[in-house]
Amino acid sequence: MAQITGDTHEWFQDWANDYDATLGKVSRHHDLLDTAVKASGIRQHDRVLDIGCGTGLLSLKFLGAADCRIKAIDSSARMLALFQEKIERYNLADRIQCIQEPAEDMECAPGEFDIIAATVSLHHVKEKAPVIRKIYDSLKEGGRFVLGDIDMDTTGRLDDPGRLKRILDYLARELELAMKEGGVQAFERMYDNGKKHILNDGEYCISFDQWAALCRNAGFPQVDIIPLQEYQWFKVLVAIK
């Protein structure tokens, strides 16, 4: 995950142990990951960077789609430890490299990757433009940046009732689905996470129009946005260098 506040970092460390049991069981999250992999146009032997890899859900889907090589980064040591267990269990050490590194501090060579992907992770980054520029520089010509996230604009004053209503319109659907698909455990996590979105406590979601503008400003000439069919407030952005 991206670099976040101390309290929020501890919250994600605590979440690591039941991450797969909550978010990993949410169907729309898997729909988002599957859409991101398909939209990436992954090919055999591509070099992939997975930003905010968590416990490896997206990376493993990339490997299921093509014989690629993955560098996976996350700021949470506990998330990476769980991912490393999967890597060892499935004998994937020659295909996946895990590094504890926040998105803001990631070190990549110019033109190193064919695909750079981030799902529900870059909204933790407060200053997004420098990270998007670094992503652009780290892609090969024709490389693809793939972003999957919720299309929710949380910018503005915390005491603005209009902003609060805008966020709650999204969160109400998320909370209902969390309870339906993951039970009380998933609901509690989503409820706690929702408060962080409202207070901008390590959560800084922006709209996909704002993401697209950041990508174009970084130099990407082509930017496309794909909404999930059943969950239109989740989208995948593909920016081609």
Predicted regions and their residues:
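Class I SAM-dependent methyltransferase SAM/SAH-binding core
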Residues: 49-51, 55-105
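Conserved beta-strand signature within the Rossmann-like core of class I S-adenosyl-L-methionine
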Residues: 143-149
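A short acidic, Gly/Pro-enriched loop at the edge of an enzyme's catalytic core
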Residues: 107-115
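A short SAM/SAH-binding and catalytic strip from SAM-dependent methyltransferases
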Residues: 114-127
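Core SAM-dependent methyltransferase catalytic element
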Residues: 218-241
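A short glycine-rich, Lys/Arg-flanked "PGG" loop and its adjoining helix->strand segment in the class I
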Residues: 130-141
